[in-house]
Swiss-Prot record:
This is Transmembrane protein 33. Keywords: Acetylation, Endoplasmic reticulum, Immunity, Innate immunity, Membrane, Nucleus, Transmembrane, Transmembrane helix. One of its GO terms (biological process) is positive regulation of IRE1-mediated unfolded protein response. Pfam families: TMEM33_Pom33.
Length: 247
């Protein structure tokens, strides 16, 4: 009987595996759609006007995925402060907020990369499970691509964190250029503090520390002008005060 367990990839078949894990399959499909829409925004093969609509579709699909994942993590919804506090600890809640921040804003390529890459990584993980359910030797070329993605996962997560950080000044620039709303930088700052405090994904916090070390190393060189050094040190102190306390 152990060989016929529904969740077991061996012998169950890909379709049976996906039907057994319906919520995971729904998120997999929405992530694939997010990747598709994001790619058509980054590479506007159908024209610039269509690219803007694909930008919105990608963020809406990501919002759906994030909502499904949040429901999976916290299935029993409660209208209480305790539930909200618990939800704000979840990465899926962070990216639900992220999607809502940018879905109606001016399309920015930098803002689509975290959505695209997170969807790609998570879709790749589930695709490997589907392939295992289909057979251990099925589609070797696709498996090779998925293995390469897995090998470069840390670099991809660092790149995502870099985008998350530099979108903060980008939202301020968009505000002064007339392409953003007054509330967007403040809401995005809240998102960034949530990413900084993330328990499951420390890359944003680690990258902040790495950037601070690099900047301090550069400005402490004798060739660095004094006013630049002071400006950088004041900026570092200001950003450090804004950073949330991490347990």
């Amino acid at each position: 009987m152990a060989d016929t367990t529904p969740n077991g990839p061996q012998g169950a078949g890909a379709v049976q595996f996906m039907m057994t894990n319906k919520l995971d399959t729904a998120m997999w499909l929405s992530r694939l759609f997010t990747v598709y829409c994001s790619a058509l925004f980054v590479l506007p093969l159908l024209g610039l006007h269509e690219a803007a609509s694909f930008y919105q579709r990608a963020l809406l699909a990501n919002a759906l995925t994030s909502a499904l994942r949040l429901h999976q993590r916290l299935p029993h919804f409660q209208l209480s402060r305790a539930f909200l506090a618990q939800a704000l600890l979840e990465d899926s809640c962070h990216y639900l907020l992220y999607s809502l921040i940018f879905v109606n804003s001016y399309p920015v390529t930098m803002s689509i990369f975290p959505v695209l890459l997170f969807s790609l990584l998570h879709a790749a993980t589930y695709t490997k499970k589907v392939l295992d359910a289909k057979g251990s030797n099925s589609l070797p070329l696709l498996r090779s691509f998925l293995d390469k993605l897995s090998t470069n996962q840390q670099n991809i997560l660092k790149f995502i964190a870099c985008n998350e950080i530099f979108l903060m000044p980008a939202t301020v620039f968009m505000l002064f250029s007339g392409q953003g709303s007054l509330l967007q930088p403040f809401i995005y700052y809240r998102f960034l503090t949530l990413r900084y405090s993330s328990r499951r994904n420390p890359y944003c916090r680690n990258l902040f520390n790495e950037l601070r070390i690099v900047v301090e190393h550069i400005i402490m060189k004798p060739s660095c002008p004094l006013f630049v050094r002071r400006l950088c040190l004041q900026s570092i102190a200001f950003i450090s005060r804004l950073a949330p306390t991490v347990a």
